[in-house]
Regions:
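Charge-rich, low-complexity amphipathic helices
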Residues: 40, 44-52, 98, 120, ...
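Compact, glycine/acidic-enriched structural inserts
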Residues: 96-134
Length: 217
């Protein structure tokens, strides 16, 4: 559990737009993780890695995904792999349907028809009896995954990697999401026949870690 939820007007306005079950959960546990950090729900926190507001700022990581990071979605949590749990803004409040945005493509699909069902089937279930084989393998390899880190595949699936825990490493969660956006943008904009020869890390002008995908000439 995180620090106590503050009672500022700004926080109250934020909670007022959320599904009532999520708002109630934040009043009890202001951001939390289960299954050794493999599943996270953000709160209103000092640390930007678990802060609902910071995580959704465009300049944090969403910028790297461009239009794929649909601003109508509030990313309220994630798996340690970077798949995003999200709520959709309907114009006056957030719809009480939980969506999942895939870490590799940010493709969207509804996964639970209410936040209450999400808590029961995704969070409580993973807290009590986790069963996702890759998540279990990650916990066996890494132990607890800190909430400020994600587990990433090297190379990415989009660069020809394959999903095996032996090819996974832990890095800062913001960096992981930025790298994912950089890879996605490079791959979808490259000619179909372009061959990837490597990646080059770099830092942008405000200090954010970036990744450049290098294609064969």
């Amino acid at each position: 559990m995180g620090e106590a939820l503050d009672d500022s007007d700004q926080t109250e306005r934020l909670l007022a737009g959320l599904p009532s079950v999520y708002a109630a959960a934040l009043r009890i546990a202001n951001g939390f993780t289960v299954h050794s950090g493999m599943n996270r729900v953000f709160g209103v926190r000092e640390d930007r890695h678990m802060d609902l507001r910071s995580w959704n700022e465009v300049e944090g990581w969403r910028f790297a995904w461009g239009e794929k990071a649909d601003p109508s979605f509030l990313m309220f949590g994630e798996t340690a792999f970077g798949d995003q749990y999200a709520l959709r803004w309907t114009g006056s409040s957030y719809e009480d349907v939980v969506y999942l945005l895939d870490v590799n493509l940010l493709s969207v699909r509804p996964i639970f028809n209410s936040f209450a069902y999400f808590l029961d089937q995704e969070i409580v279930q993973n807290a009590i009896s986790p069963s996702h084989p890759t998540a279990l393998a990650c916990v066996e390899k890494f132990g607890r995954v800190p909430f400020n880190e994600n587990v990433v595949l090297t190379p990415s699936l989009l660069l020809g990697g394959y999903e095996d825990v032996s090819n996974m490493v832990k890095i800062d969660s913001y960096a992981a999401m930025i790298y994912g956006g950089d890879i996605y943008t490079a791959v979808v904009s490259a000619p179909d026949e372009a061959a990837v020869v490597g990646v080059e890390p770099w830092v942008d002008d405000i200090g954010r870690p970036r990744l450049r995908v290098v294609f064969a000439d």
